[in-house]
Amino acid sequence: MAKKANRHHENGRAAAATSAAADGKQPARMKTKDYLREKRRLDADLVAMQEWVKATGAKICVAFEGRDTAGKGGTIKAITERVSPRVFRVVALPAPTEREKSQMYIQRYIPHLPAAGEVVIFDRSWYNRAGVERVMGFCTEEQVAFFLKEVPEFEQAMVTSGILLLKYWLEVSPDEQTRRLESRIDDPRKIWKLSDMDLKSYSRWYDYSRARDDMFKASDTA
């Protein structure tokens, strides 16, 4: 990825180091009162940012990736619950249709990119190819290699067009992932979150770690 886009991206190597450390140990939890206090402050910041986006015509694209149960959906819900759906839009695409499979891989994501005055949040993104699809065998290694080669150019084109691109990887430790999956199984209010894919991916922890690290290296801007 060109250095010009660097100011709009998280540093890949730093993210890789952080997530690799999380493989072994889960960070300490915040106390509920501290979390609620901080969230109120951040909600106010988000509302202020929303007004800035509307006033300036900014285009913001946020991509959330991470392991299953890492908290992507919950994080996105927390971000969007106090802002306007006219400005903030969440994109969570289903499995590709047969027609989409025949198209250029990145094509299905392009119509969802933000216009002026919009914030678009992807709950999983084009990085599916480097993560889920690779680990679960839904694409070939040749397709993964091509994607990792082309994605910096795609993202550079986004940035050049005026889109502010932010990418986040959410990590979870093996023990915490086990606890969260068991919670979904045992709680009828959460069972809808559990899929066959969750259970299959659970057994492929190190495959996901390797895919994650390869993804960081290929999309690093430093």
Describe every region a protein language model picked out:
Residues M1-A222:
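Glycine-rich phosphate-binding loop of ATP-dependent small-molecule kinases
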